[in-house]
Amino acid sequence: MEKVWLEAQSNIKKVLTPQTYNTWIKPIRFHTLTDDNLTLEVPSKFIKEWVTEKYLPMIVEAISSLTSVKYQIEFKITEKIPLESKPVDNFTPVIKDNEPSKETNKNIDITANLNPKYTFDSFVCGASNQFAHAASQAVASNPASNYNPLFIYGGVGLGKTHLLIAIGNHIKENNKKAKICYYSSEKFMNEMINCLRYKKMDEFRNKFRKMDILLIDDIQFMAGKEATQEEFFHTFNALYESHKQIVVTSDKFPKDIPGLEERLRSRFEWGLIADIQPPDIETKIAILKKKSDLNSITLPNDVALFLASSATSNVRELEGMLIRLGAYASLTGSEITLNMARDILKDIIVEKTKDITVEMIQKHVAEHFKIKVSELKSDKRLKTFVVPRQIAIFICRELTKSSYPEIGEKFGGKDHSTIIHSVKKIEKQMANDLEIKNIVENLKKELIT
C-alpha cells in the first residue's frame, strides 16, 4: 500500500503548484492499512487540520483511482522530526541557568519593542489571511520545528507586522527565558552601519546570533544593499544551523523582490511561504467591529459597512478612520451616524457609492423581491409592492447623491414629500424590525460589493 500512496502523491503533484505540493502533500507518509481504514502520517497538527479541510477529497480520489476502493482516511501526527529543521529539545534558550546574572540580562530588553496589543486574540482572521494566521500560530506554538523560516508577504497595512509581533508575544508569554529579537530591516541596516563605524561588528553579530527567535519586518528594504544582505545572510545561516526560528515579512513574494540576492531568496523558500490578501468586505467589517470594541467606540452597522466599502484595503487606514470618528464623537458628545461619517471622512474616503445609480438599485431590489421594476415605480398600494418600493427609495437616499425630488422623478414622478415619508418609514422599521434591517443591510452590501 505504501507504493500506492507514493503513486497517488505523484499524481497529486501534477495538479498542484510545487509550493503547495511541497508544503502539504509531500510531508505525508503511509502508516497503516486496516480493512478499509487507511492511516497516513503527518508531521504536525497544523498540517493535519489544513490537509483535512483543503485536500482530503483530492487524496481520497487519487487513491481510489488506483485501487477502486474509497478508503476511510485518518491522519496520525508522527513523533518524527523532519531532518531539514530539528527543533532544540524543549526549546531551550541560548543562555544557561548557571551563567552570571549580568550576562543573562544582556540584551534581554530587546523584546521591549514587542507591542503588547499585537496578539493572536486581537487579530481578525478571515478568508484573506487564514493561511498566514494559521502558519503563524503553528510557528509560535512550536518554534523551529516544521516551518523555518516562515516568510509572510502581502500588501501594505494588511496585518503582516501584527502577525510577526503576535508570534513574538506568544512565545514570550510561554517561555519567559526565550531571547526574541524583532527588528525592521531598516533598523537592522542602521545598527549594522553604526557598528561598522565604531568597529563593533563582533558585538553586533553576537547580539543577533544569540537569539532564539529572529523576527525581521519588511525584508524588501534590504534589496540592493549588498553589505546588509551579506551580514543578514550569515546571521540567517548561524541561526538556522542552531535550529532557531526565523520569521520574515515582505510586501512581495521572494522571487518578485528586485535586488534581493539569489542565496537569500532560496533560503526564504526553504521553509513555508504564506501570503495575506486584501480583506473582503466581511473581514473589514469584522476588523472594524473588533477595533471599535477594543477602543470603546459605538459603531453602528451602517457606518461599519460604509467604512468597509471604501476603496481602501489597508487595515491601518480603516483603523485611522474609526479612531477619527471616535474622537469626534467623544469631543462633541454626539453619536456616530452615517451622515457624520460621510462629513468627517469626506477628505480621505473614496466612496464606491458614487458609481451606484437609482436605476441599479431599482433593478436589484426588484430582483430580490421578484417583482418588475415597473411595479416598483408604480402607484400600486399592495404591500407586495409598497415595502420593496420604500426600501428601494431608502437605499437610493443612502447610496446615491440624488436629492429627494430627483429620486421621486425616477420613481414615476412621485412628490418629494412621498420620498421623505418612505425614507422615514424604513428608518423607523429598521429600528424595530430586525428582519427589515437585515434585508436593507444585505441589499446595500450586495450593491456596494
Curated annotation (Swiss-Prot):
Region (Domain III, AAA+ region): 113-329
Stretches the record annotates as Domain II: 69-112
Keyword annotations from UniProtKB, A to Z: ATP-binding, Cytoplasm, DNA replication, DNA-binding, Lipid-binding, Nucleotide-binding
Pfam families documented for this protein: Bac_DnaA, Bac_DnaA_C, DnaA_N
InterPro entries, per database record: AAA+_ATPase (IPR003593), Chromosome_initiator_DnaA (IPR001957), Chromosome_initiator_DnaA-like (IPR020591), Chromosome_initiator_DnaA_CS (IPR018312), DnaA_C (IPR013159), DnaA_dom (IPR013317), DnaA_N_dom (IPR024633), DnaA_N_sf (IPR038454)
Region described as Domain IV, binds dsDNA: spans on this chain: 330-449
Annotated binding of ATP, by residue: G157, G159, K160, T161
Family: Belongs to the DnaA family.
Subunit text: Oligomerizes as a right-handed, spiral filament on DNA at oriC.
Alphabetized PANTHER family for the sequence: CHROMOSOMAL REPLICATION INITIATOR PROTEIN DNAA
Protein name as it appears in the record: Chromosomal replication initiator protein DnaA
Provenance organism: Geotalea uraniireducens (strain Rf4)
Gene behind the chain: dnaA
